[in-house]
Structure formats: structure tokens, C-alpha cells
């Protein structure tokens, strides 16, 4: 009997598994977001007349509002389910980029953009972390975090180059339109998913009070360090390259080639993170990440930027995979309280980022040298190790 290959049947078979649906949706999402994320701070920077303080105040406001809304988000996620929350978040992110598209028409779109992105984050990130903590298995969590990294990295290897090319030829309006379409497509796999309900029980006071518990002190330090270091990479590093007069296409190329190198390490770092060497891997990655930030301080040319960012991405992967694996281990060990722990993480992650970005905005008024803050990131990178000593996998 002849074999008939049906693309529709193949896609249906491929998307039957819950993890596959999750990873596919994330991969498509980052294909779109990867086109614009690296250029987004630059767009906002140009809108505010090349003012770094105003740019940081705008971004910090998003994270601050996210921190204030996330407890309500946890209760809403309890009602609509994890997958539906991630699905609905796309429409708010869609609205955010639409607001950026029209931001030059009226200043009204500035607060609207802040509100829409905050709501989008509130629906997506807690649901994302809870879902991953639930379906990933303890014995293979490092490997699954590595696979998640690859699901994010593979599309984002190409998307910054594509985004940079679109931006250089057609401008931001066409780029935002493409991103909006891809975001909507990324929701399709979630329609195929069996949803999961969580019961989030923390009051507003109890959720915020978790930050001040003595038992969470080391977690606090690790999560704050992680958040602030990522902020410098996400917001100041792109601005630094732009101020250096590196073109959009070159910036996209630097990010893409660095991510390509990183993808090679993600799978192996994930396997090591499932062994008794997780803590050692985290410490090694944290130290190397710190060194890479010191090297970024001395960047003068696009080639320097490529080399140092490639080292950073490799080092950050070596630190980030065991860090995330440990975080998900702690969350999963909480069982019914996993969602409460993750909401606590979102509060401390974003409120610390808001205060940090607001502080930087003030500092930039009197000390506008961007690369000086790369040395701050070098110190913050070492703070990731505070999480590494708390949960170690059993030796096998």
C-alpha cells in the first residue's frame, strides 16, 4: 500500500504533545519579538529626542506597573487558565506595538503603551513560568531548560538580521506590522493545548510580604541580581551600540551571530545542569559573565562588540541554564504554592528593575557614559550564585 505524506497530518501529530505545543508557540513568538526587541529601546530613545533618562523612565514604568498588577494577574490566571492567559497576552502586546506605531501622533499613546505592555507581561510571564514548572520533570529539568533556550534562540538567530534589514530599508512601521502578524500566529499552538487551572490564594499584602521574609533573603539577592543584570543587557547594551554609530543591520548581525554560537552550548549546558555539577556550572558561568561585562567596557569597534557579546552570550548561557533549572526546581517543590512563589519572583524581579532604571535615569543626567554601567553588570552577574547553593540535584 503506498505511503501518502500529508503535511496537515504531520503538523497535527507534531503538535499533539503538550511540551511541543508550548515550545512551538514560544519559538514563533520569539521569531517575531526577536525582530524588534533589540531595536525597541533605540526606537523609544529616538522618540524621546535621544534622551537616555526619559527612555529609562518609560521602560522602568512598564516594569513598575507590572509589579503592581501581577497579584491581580495571578488571580485572573486562576480563572482563565495558564494557556488562555498566554494567548490573551498576545493581544495586549499587539496593542503595545500598535501604540508605538502611532506614538508620534499623540503623547496619549505613551501611557497607553506602558499600560498595554504591563498587562501583556502580567498575563504572559507568570503563566509561562508556572506552566513550565508544572510540565518539566525534575530529573531532566536542566535539559528541558536547555531545549527551551534553543526554542527561543533558533528563531532569534535569524530575526535580528531580518529585523535590522527591514528597519534599514522600510523603517519601523513595516517592522511593527510584521511583528504583529507573527505574534498572532504564535497563538495558534495554544488553541490546541489542554489548559491547566491554578488556584492562586495570596492576598496583595501576603504576596508582597514574601520579599521581606528572612528565609527568602538569598533568593531575593539572586533574583534582584538576575533582573538588574538582564536590564543592562536588554536596554543599555543596544543603546550603547547605537550611540557608537553601529548601523541597524550590523547591530542585528552582532546579536544574531552571538545567538548562533550560544545555541550550540545550550543543549550541553542543559545536560550538565541535570548532573551534580549544576552549582559549579552556575559559578563558572557567573564569573565568565562578569568578565565579559568588563571586556564590554572597552569596546570601541563593531568587531569588538561582536567578540565581547559572543563571549557574554556563551557565559550567560552557562550561568542562566543552571540558574533557571534551580529556580524551576524550587517552584516545583512548592507544589500547590508554585504559583505563589512565581508571583513573588515577578514582584521582586520587576519592582527592583523599576527602582534601578529610575535610579539610572537620574544618574545619566550628570554622568552620561553608558559603558560605565557595564562594570555594575559585572558585579551583578556574581549575584546569580546566591541561588545556586540552595537546591542541588541528587548525585546520580
Model segments located where?
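Intracellular juxtamembrane helix-capping segments at the cytosolic ends
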Residues: 123-137, 317-335
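Symmetry-related core transmembrane helices of the 12-TM Major Facilitator Superfamily/SLC fold
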Residues: 174-192, 371-389
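Conserved MFS/SLC helix-loop-helix module at the cytosolic interface between two early adjacent transmembrane helices
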Residues: 68-104
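Structural signature of the two symmetry-related core transmembrane helices
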Residues: 84-99, 180, 280-295
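Cytoplasmic helix-loop-helix junction between adjacent transmembrane helices
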Residues: 115-152
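Helix-loop boundary and gating motifs at the non-cytosolic
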Residues: 3-67, 213-256, 312, 373-374
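Hydrophobic core of transmembrane alpha-helices in multi-pass small-molecule transporters
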Residues: 27, 107-124, 224, 303-320
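Helix-to-loop junctions at the C-terminal end of transmembrane segments
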Residues: 69-82, 167, 264-278
Amino acid at each position: 500500500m503506498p505511503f501518502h505524506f500529508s503535511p496537515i497530518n504531520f503538523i497535527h501529530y507534531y503538535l499533539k504533545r503538550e511540551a511541543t505545543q508550548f515550545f512551538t508557540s514560544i519559538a514563533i513568538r520569539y521569531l517575531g519579538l526577536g525582530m524588534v526587541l533589540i531595536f525597541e529601546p533605540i526606537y523609544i530613545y529616538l522618540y524621546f529626542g535621544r534622551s537616555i533618562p526619559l527612555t529609562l523612565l518609560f521602560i522602568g514604568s512598564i516594569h513598575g506597573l507590572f509589579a503592581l498588577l501581577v497579584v491581580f494577574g495571578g488571580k485572573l490566571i486562576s480563572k482563565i487558565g495558564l494557556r488562555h492567559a498566554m494567548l490573551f497576552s498576545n493581544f495586549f502586546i499587539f496593542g503595545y506595538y500598535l501604540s508605538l506605531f502611532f506614538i508620534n501622533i499623540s503623547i496619549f499613546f505613551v501611557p497607553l503603551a506602558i499600560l498595554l505592555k504591563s498587562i501583556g507581561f502580567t498575563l504572559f510571564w507568570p503563566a509561562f513560568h508556572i506552566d513550565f514548572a508544572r510540565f518539566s520533570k525534575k530529573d531532566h529539568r536542566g535539559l528541558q531548560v536547555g531545549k527551551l533556550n534553543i526554542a527561543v534562540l533558533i528563531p532569534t538567530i535569524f530575526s535580528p538580521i531580518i529585523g535590522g534589514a527591514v528597519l534599514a530599508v522600510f523603517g519601523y512601521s513595516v517592522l511593527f506590522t510584521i511583528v504583529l502578524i507573527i505574534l498572532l500566529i504564535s497563538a495558534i499552538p495554544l488553541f490546541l493545548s489542554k489548559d491547566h487551572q491554578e488556584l492562586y490564594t495570596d492576598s496583595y499584602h501576603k504576596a508582597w510580604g514574601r520579599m521581606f521574609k528572612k528565609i527568602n533573603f538569598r533568593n531575593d539577592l539572586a533574583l534582584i541580581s538576575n533582573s538588574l543584570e538582564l536590564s543592562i543587557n536588554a536596554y543599555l547594551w543596544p543603546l550603547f551600540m547605537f550611540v557608537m554609530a553601529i548601523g541597524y543591520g550590523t547591530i542585528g548581525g552582532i546579536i544574531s551571530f552571538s545567538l548562533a554560537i550560544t545555541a550550540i552550548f545550550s543543549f550541553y549546558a542543559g545536560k550538565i545542569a541535570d548532573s551534580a555539577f549544576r552549582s559549579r556550572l552556575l559559578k563558572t558561568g557567573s564569573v565568565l559573565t562578569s568578565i565579559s561585562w568588563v571586556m564590554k567596557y572597552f569596546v570601541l569597534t563593531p568587531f569588538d562588540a561582536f567578540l565581547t557579546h559572543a563571549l557574554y552570550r556563551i557565559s550567560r548561557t552557562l550561568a542562566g541554564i543552571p540558574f533557571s533549572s534551580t529556580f524551576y526546581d524550587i517552584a516545583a517543590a512548592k507544589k500547590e504554592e508554585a504559583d505563589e512563589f512565581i508571583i513573588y519572583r515577578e514582584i521582586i524581579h520587576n519592582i527592583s528593575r523599576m527602582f534601578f532604571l529610575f535610579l539610572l535615569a537620574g544618574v545619566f543626567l550628570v554622568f552620561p557614559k553608558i559603558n560605565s554601567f557595564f562594570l555594575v553588570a559585572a558585579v551583578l552577574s556574581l549575584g546569580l550564585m546566591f541561588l545556586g547553593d540552595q537546591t542541588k540535584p541528587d548525585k546520580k
